Amino acid sequence: PGMVTKYFGFLCNYVLLGFKETNSYLKNCKTIFTGTPLREQFYKFNFLPEWVPKGNGPLLIVMGGSQGAKAINQILYESLEFLIKKQFRIVHIVGESNLKPFHVKNSKNYIQKKFTNEIAALIQNCDLVISRSGAGTINELMEAEKPSILIPYPYSKNNHQEKNAMILAASGGSVLINQNKMSKEVFEETLERIFKIKSKKGKNHYEILDLMKKNMENNNKIKSKNEIKKYIDYFLKEF
């Protein structure tokens, strides 16, 4: 929770929580878990944008928040030839100030953008998200039931990004890699493990990725927009 909520929440009748786990930090407050409101796009299905690379390879969405993330960008650049060789399709959201020409010879499977307004469509239709772990991103991944590799911003206040990432990692829906542990080798080995093909009843599938998807489906989520409205209406009548 933020400092205002942490120190003055006890004065409120109730504090509405984005994560159940936040309750342990607000022991003197009455709390209700509602989830966090998201952009409207996340509450409906969106088709994959036409500009996304076509093909049968797994689709990765790599992003670092509105300002991008230089550490994530750098690892992606270092591993790009490996990813293309493995037939991944990559949409790389680099952030406003980080766009630069970067091409892999003879490949149309990599697209770089400063930002996009179609992030819901990308997350809903991709196979894996690689990202920082701000609260908004965590809730978007939960709503879309999407597996991820999360690399928390190491200088976030009270290390909250790592705590956010631990929620999904503990559920088995995400792999958490701290930035100081991240390297080209660790990144590539993690992807190879997640996308290792296993045969079952004559059909090939990604065993680890499928398990991560199932774990994300089991995560608690609430349509928070309606849930919060319900409590606001109730409190207005009561008080």
Language-model segment annotations:
Residues 43-131, 162-166, 170, 177-187:
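Donor-nucleotide binding loops and adjacent catalytic segments primarily
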Residues 221-239:
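C-terminal alpha-helical cap of glycosyltransferases
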